[in-house]
Amino acid sequence: MATVQEIRNAQRADGPATVLAIGTATPAHSVNQADYPDYYFRITKSEHMTELKEKFKRMCDKSMIKKRYMYLTEEILKENPNMCAYMAPSLDARQDIVVVEVPKLGKEAATKAIKEWGQPKSKITHLIFCTTSGVDMPGADYQLTKLIGLRPSVKRFMMYQQGCFAGGTVLRLAKDLAENNKGARVLVVCSEITAVTFRGPADTHLDSLVGQALFGDGAAAVIVGADPDTSVERPLYQLVSTSQTILPDSDGAIDGHLREVGLTFHLLKDVPGLISKNIEKSLSEAFAPLGISDWNSIFWIAHPGGPAILDQVESKLGLKGEKLKATRQVLSEYGNMSSACVLFILDEMRKKSVEEAKATTGEGLDWGVLFGFGPGLTVETVVLHSVPIKA
């Protein structure tokens, strides 16, 4: 008869959790950032607020965003005038949209990831679904299981209302699942739609306007598993270690509240300052075991909360301009897609590394870091190891 320890040992994987495929998706409708202030103030019937519109234009100009994708079209907004007001009861209308569209967009990303992985979906043992867009029972995890046709016995984890740090959280959870369940293949999906946060402007709530200038829609999916079968699976990144921390003196720095008016967004403190002041501590703790202290010697995937965060992190750590190139590229092309962003950046980096004939998936470097920043202020840190690119 097997002992508990023998059973335990048999359940564990031998190697580290590894990203085996990545897929991304966006709604069909996109907006150009340069034209967005005119469109936004027109659709919300706020054109009389000329000073506020000028402020919003400056926010959009400084955002370093060229384009964003949005499920909400002019037609949908005209049918739902309460969503265009600043604080009108509109949660039902928002929920009706997101409970359908969040799993649908997630399915698009997941289908691409499964196709790249190349294995039957019946081999998926666990599903992690993450969204800050709407809440329902049974959740988006259940809806996605049905939409894709996963096994009814797939083990599901639903993460709601985590916000912008959650791209790190899902990888942390996927790592623990893959390494503690031999043969596990974890499908991770982050799907975000701004229909829950879109609202008209108010000169009493400028931080809400910041959100209107930055947030975009997108979904990303990854497959994570340990001990890949390299005859049929292609490793992309190894997840080496993970941590989560709440930054000191950051209570209320970023808040979101789900109300009758939808999800409201509040920035109460100097978020870029708080992150840049504390980031070196997180890096030092994560990389001390590896003897790494030169932050230019690793590849970087940082949640692009906004350009000011990236600028201050770059300056504080003395990072070379190219270090945040993939991060800035995703911000420019998609805006801030909350939890999905870092997975889009992983995808961007592995593709560019191949295009530019780099030696590894990490821009030719071996070690890298993935950061999620969000409400709390919470920071997720993931240490990544790249994989050699075979010519």
UniProtKB/Swiss-Prot annotation:
Give the positions the UniProt entry annotates as the active site.
C164
Q: Which GO terms describe its molecular function?
A: naringenin-chalcone synthase activity
Its EC number(s): 2.3.1.74
Q: Which SUPFAM superfamilies match?
A: Thiolase-like (SSF53901)
Q: Which CDD domains does the record associate with it? A: CHS_like (cd00831)
Q: Which InterPro entries match?
A: Chalcone/stilbene_synt_C (IPR012328), Chalcone/stilbene_synt_N (IPR001099), Chalcone/stilbene_synthase_AS (IPR018088), Polyketide_synthase_type-III (IPR011141), Thiolase-like (IPR016039)
Q: Which Pfam families match?
A: Chal_sti_synt_C, Chal_sti_synt_N
**For this UniProt entry, which residues form the secretion signal?**
none
**Metabolic or biological pathway:** Secondary metabolite biosynthesis; flavonoid biosynthesis
The record lists the catalysed reaction(s) as: (E)-4-coumaroyl-CoA + 3 malonyl-CoA + 3 H(+) = 2',4,4',6'-tetrahydroxychalcone + 3 CO2 + 4 CoA
User: What biological function has been recorded for the protein in this entry?
Assistant: The primary product of this enzyme is 4,2',4',6'-tetrahydroxychalcone (also termed naringenin-chalcone or chalcone) which can under specific conditions spontaneously isomerize into naringenin.
Question: Any idea what this protein is called?
Answer: Chalcone synthase 2
Q: Which organism is it from?
A: Citrus sinensis
